[in-house]
């Protein structure tokens, strides 16, 4: 069972998800509308099984989940956190919440030396997020081809290619709180 870390800021609680968060996370992703919406079961399962490498943000005043990152430790690269989805409520955008969630995940997972994520070229917010993270923590980044359009079924509305972002190595500073 994952230790349920919780970080308190003026406006938010940053914490590891629980299976009870799966439904609200599904609602958040559905509300956002520009992410691939998976089954509600997958979010419940993700919040339970991959809690150590994921994060939710709860708004203090409304007690609503307003942010979520799903991640997992790459099975072939033990020092690499792979980020699958980044979701921020439209009511909370422009506050740096996605970056703060990534920084908190790095603080909680000290063994992480690299972050990877796939991003479509047209997804400017995610492009800016990962490049901005690399700049903020003063580390390297590499962008390479990963999934071509022909990797996806033709019935998938001609899914756009996905580029692989690799951020790192991380420079650890144990005395610095990240968010």
Swiss-Prot record:
Per the record, the pathway is: Amine and polyamine biosynthesis; ectoine biosynthesis; L-ectoine from L-aspartate 4-semialdehyde: step 2/3
Asked whether the keyword Acyltransferase is assigned, the reply is: yes
Q: Which PROSITE patterns match?
A: GNAT
What GO biological process terms are annotated to this protein in UniProt?
ectoine biosynthetic process
Q: Which UniProt keywords apply?
A: Acyltransferase, Transferase
EC number(s) reported in the record: 2.3.1.178
InterPro entries linked to this entry: Acyl_CoA_acyltransferase, Ectoine_EctA, GNAT_dom
Q: Which SUPFAM superfamilies match?
A: Acyl-CoA N-acyltransferases (Nat)
Q: Which domain of life is it from?
A: Bacteria
Task: List GO molecular-function terms, semicolon-separated.
Answer: diaminobutyrate acetyltransferase activity
Keyword Transferase tagged: yes
N-acetyltransferase domain ranges (all copies): 12-153
Q: Report the family membership.
A: Belongs to the acetyltransferase family. EctA subfamily.
Q: Which named protein is this?
A: L-2,4-diaminobutyric acid acetyltransferase
Q: Which organism is it from?
A: Oceanobacillus iheyensis (strain DSM 14371 / CIP 107618 / JCM 11309 / KCTC 3954 / HTE831)
Q: What is the lineage of its organism?
A: Bacteria, Bacillati, Bacillota, Bacilli, Bacillales
Q: Gene name on record?
A: ectA
């Amino acid at each position: 069972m994952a230790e349920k870390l919780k970080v308190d800021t003026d406006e938010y609680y940053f914490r590891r998800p629980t299976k009870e968060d799966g439904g609200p996370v599904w609602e958040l992703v559905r509300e956002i509308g520009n992410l691939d919406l998976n089954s509600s079961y997958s979010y419940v399962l993700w919040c339970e099984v991959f809690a150590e490498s994921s994060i939710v943000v709860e708004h203090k005043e409304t007690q609503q989940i307003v942010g979520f990152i799903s991640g997992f430790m790459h099975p072939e690269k033990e020092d690499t956190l792979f980020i699958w989805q980044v979701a921020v409520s439209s009511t909370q955008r422009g506050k740096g919440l996605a970056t703060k969630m990534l920084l908190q995940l790095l603080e909680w997972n000290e063994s992480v030396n690299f972050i990877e994520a796939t991003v479509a070229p047209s997804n400017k917010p995610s492009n800016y997020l990962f490049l901005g993270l690399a700049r903020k923590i003063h580390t390297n980044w590499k962008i390479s081809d990963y999934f071509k359009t022909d990797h996806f079924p033709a019935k998938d509305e001609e899914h756009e290619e996905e580029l692989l972002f690799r951020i790192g190595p991380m420079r650890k500073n144990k005395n610095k709180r990240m968010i």
